[in-house]
A protein has these predicted regions:
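N-terminal secretory targeting modules
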Residues: 1-173
Length: 173
């Protein structure tokens, strides 16, 4: 089975400011359910992505001072994430100036997610109001193969032309 693009399985807030604080508590505030790349319905197959940036707008419920993102893959081979960013959403594909944050995974800005696994980003400082929208941008430097997707998504996602557009304030595609 070819690799499938992972999903943003959750964002959260921390009640404590110290990463080593045993009282720190993360709360999931957004997630989605994915479908197979091809449901057998003409026109609904997703061939995947190749050297592109994906920007997904997520409407969160709980706000906070710090956020982190979980990414997963359902594929039989690893999924390479070349870079990932999170920012406050402006309009369309635009992000609010000054809100862009680089996501890292164990201190590294890129990661290969093993088949069937999920990864959690390191926390980043970002003051997020409750009931706001965030833009999560993921650059995939190679061909992902068929990508999982959500059949009844209620937010517009953006796909760039070839290249790294993850921190652009303007439209990502």
């Amino acid at each position: 089975m070819p690799p499938l693009l992972g999903d943003m399985a959750g964002l959260g807030k921390a009640s404590g400011a110290n990463e080593n604080n045993p009282n720190e508590h993360w709360v999931g505030t957004w997630s989605n359910a994915l479908h197979q790349p091809d449901l057998g319905v003409p026109g609904l197959a997703n061939p995947g992505f190749n050297n592109q940036t994906l920007r997904q707008i997520v409407h969160i419920s709980v706000g906070g001072r710090r956020v982190r993102v979980r990414l997963s893959t359902f594929g039989a081979s690893g999924l390479v994430i070349g870079a990932a960013h999170i920012a406050l959403h402006a309009t369309g594909a635009a992000i609010l100036t000054g809100s862009d944050r680089t996501l890292t995974f164990g201190g590294t800005p890129s990661i290969t997610i093993p088949p069937g696994a999920l990864v959690v980003s390191d926390p980043v400082e970002l003051n997020v109001p409750e009931l706001s929208d965030l833009a999560v941008s993921i650059f995939v430097p190679g061909n992902t193969g068929p990508a999982a997707w959500h059949f009844e998504g209620r937010q517009t996602s953006f796909i760039s032309p070839s290249g790294r557009f993850y921190s652009k304030r303007r439209d990502a595609g």
